Swiss-Prot record:
<dbReference type="GO" id="GO:0046872">
    <property type="term" value="F:metal ion binding"/>
</dbReference>
<feature type="binding site">
    <location>
        <position position="67"/>
    </location>
    <ligand>
        <name>[4Fe-4S] cluster 1</name>
    </ligand>
</feature>
<feature type="domain" description="TRAM">
    <location>
        <begin position="404"/>
        <end position="466"/>
    </location>
</feature>
<dbReference type="InterPro" id="IPR006463">
    <property type="entry name" value="MiaB_methiolase"/>
</dbReference>
<keyword id="KW-0949">S-adenosyl-L-methionine</keyword>
<dbReference type="GO" id="GO:0005829">
    <property type="term" value="C:cytosol"/>
</dbReference>
<feature type="binding site">
    <location>
        <position position="31"/>
    </location>
    <ligand>
        <name>[4Fe-4S] cluster 1</name>
    </ligand>
</feature>
<keyword id="KW-0808">Transferase</keyword>
<comment type="function">
    <text>Catalyzes the methylthiolation of N6-(dimethylallyl)adenosine (i(6)A), leading to the formation of 2-methylthio-N6-(dimethylallyl)adenosine (ms(2)i(6)A) at position 37 in tRNAs that read codons beginning with uridine.</text>
</comment>
<keyword id="KW-0004">4Fe-4S</keyword>
<dbReference type="InterPro" id="IPR005839">
    <property type="entry name" value="Methylthiotransferase"/>
</dbReference>
<dbReference type="Pfam" id="PF01938">
    <property type="entry name" value="TRAM"/>
</dbReference>
<comment type="subunit">
    <text>Monomer.</text>
</comment>
<dbReference type="InterPro" id="IPR007197">
    <property type="entry name" value="rSAM"/>
</dbReference>
<dbReference type="InterPro" id="IPR038135">
    <property type="entry name" value="Methylthiotransferase_N_sf"/>
</dbReference>
<feature type="binding site">
    <location>
        <position position="183"/>
    </location>
    <ligand>
        <name>[4Fe-4S] cluster 2</name>
    </ligand>
</feature>
<dbReference type="InterPro" id="IPR002792">
    <property type="entry name" value="TRAM_dom"/>
</dbReference>
Amino acid sequence: MTQETALLPTSPEAGDLNVPARKVFVKTYGCQMNVYDSDRMSDALSRDGYVATDVLEEADFVLLNTCHIREKAAEKVYSELGRLRDLKKAKAREGREMLIGVAGCVAQAEGKEILRRAPAVDLVIGPQTYHRLPEALRRARTGERIVETDYAIEDKFVHLPAPDKAKTRARGVTAFLTVQEGCDKFCTFCVVPYTRGSEVSRPVAQIVAEAEKLVEGGVREITLLGQNVNAWHGAGPHGREWGLGDLLRRLGEIEGLARLRYTTSHPRDMDDSLIEAHRSMAKLMPYLHLPVQSGSDRILKAMNRRHTAAEYLALVARIRAVQPDLALSGDFIVGFPGETDEDFEDTLRLVDAVNYAQAFSFKYSTRPGTPGAELEQQVPEDVKAKRLEILQALLIKQQRGFAEACVGREIDLLLEKPGRMPGQLVGRSPWLQPVNVDAKASQIGDIIRVRITKAGPNSLFAEMIGETEARS
């Protein structure tokens, strides 16, 4: 996934009004956390005098916020950097300067190697040092080539600017909020512990303050983010240890915040308090992304997942017992080293047993530096491709079945943005599906009562039937 993120205009006090403002173009690859990080870097640069452009050729600074989760991710970045190098040279011939920066997990993994392989790059900055971006960019403008890839994660959240009310309102009625970063699980296929570091949880007060700022800016729904978001822990009142369930309950007390979600979860960190939140919290949407990766105990052990297929299924049953309306999503990897036809059949059996509302599935890709890269019995590409085709066909069938079962249901719908057709808006169902409905643009941010009338391939259609809970 890529997303182009443009900064919003800076305020006049950000710089001399007689000097043309510098323009920045941010391209975001990968997960929701990168989208969140791009927004926060954008806020920091905006306060330093940068303004938006969604036209690459206009940019004085181009920043690629990268993802390293899949094979050849770094090579794709280098390919993009080659194109940017050519643009930089063309602008230099016209007497115009353009700096290039690389952020995100490729920056963390590659570090100085990026400067060696891509001499046009001026700045490399890892995920834990985004608060240093404005200063690093000032240094880069003097000709210094910058690499900032240490793990000062505590400083990052302390020093990044709080969400700006005007910018928040312009970004929409839903928002991401990172509460946890890093991973201590060390699954053998995954680079995250090496690019994002150890698990670190943000303090309660800091999270609540940011959530309140978002709500002040018109946000109605917040999704809490973390590499292992349900590993979040912090100190509550009187020093009591809090888990994610406690944090959700505290955020649920914020007036004006209508909905909460969280992602991504690890099965081992789904504790009783969090499961209970799915029963008792009306604001917590009945949707859970709970990756399992494989249905084979042998492969799960090789992946270092530290749970069995039976334990995963038992956990799903516990959660559905308290929230029968739950939509479950998952992640799957096919073709992990040593995976046999029988192992793959175990995965299909698990998928049948769970009946996912949606899921994400991928062929195993070797990640340099991970234990999985050293394993023997690598599965041939054609075998991986065939297994992925079979698995995705089953998952698509389940997703369509879930969507069709929604037809006729009445739900509360948060209207998020204009639809593709005139007079149409799009919102998200409680189960995260896009829902199209005829409504006025002035109703964006409202929660309306609708009846689902049709299930399309990738979205639902609805008619309005009830009163509006207006956005304040």
